[in-house]
């Protein structure tokens, strides 16, 4: 039986001041994802922003990560990628990394896509793999507290608006994307 406090435990782990180690997966291979998940990483991030990723491949990779006990994150295309956010969460991702956030309004839009009403605008579809963790009521009833929402800091506008972005309710972490910062 899966505990319904998984999100609380995840959030407590995030704020525990103990470093969490993970990697970006660009191989698009469930076998590689499974090997890394069993290697002791705390989290693995599947990159759907770059490269050819379809839902079948993503589904297999998320299952593989789950089998090894690591937390799964999926990087989507942006705050306006509602279908990518929805699909990743429906397939069982533990969290979402949203790139190209420049304003608090964009951050709010990203958070809204990740959360069920009344906190957000995520739609419900069942049966889905993510609900296997606790059943429909157990899942939908606590998922707003469970999902990890990370925003990628990578633009000058984001840095300029960092204070207001960081105040958006529902954000668990800001991730520094050093390559594109300008």
Predicted regions and their residues:
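Expand to "…catalyze enediolate/carbanion chemistry for C-C bond making/breaking, isomerization
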Residues: 1-182
């Amino acid at each position: 039986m899966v505990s319904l406090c998984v999100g609380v435990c995840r959030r407590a782990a995030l704020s525990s001041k103990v470093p969490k180690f993970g990697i970006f997966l660009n191989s698009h291979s469930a076998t590689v994802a499974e090997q890394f998940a069993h290697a002791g990483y705390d989290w693995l991030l599947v990159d759907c922003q770059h490269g050819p990723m379809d839902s079948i491949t993503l589904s297999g990779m998320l299952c593989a990560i789950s089998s090894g006990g690591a937390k799964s994150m999926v990087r989507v295309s942006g705050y306006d990628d509602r279908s990518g956010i929805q699909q990743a969460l429906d397939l069982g991702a533990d969290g979402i990394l949203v790139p190209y956030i420049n304003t608090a309004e964009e951050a709010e839009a990203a958070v809204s896509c990740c959360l069920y009403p009344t906190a957000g605008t995520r739609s419900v579809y069942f049966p889905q793999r993510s609900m296997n963790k606790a059943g429909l009521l157990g899942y939908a009833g606590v998922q707003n507290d469970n999902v990890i929402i990370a925003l990628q800091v990578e633009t000058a506008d984001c840095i300029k608006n960092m204070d207001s972005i960081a105040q958006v309710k529902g954000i668990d972490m800001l991730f520094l994307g050093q390559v594109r910062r300008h």
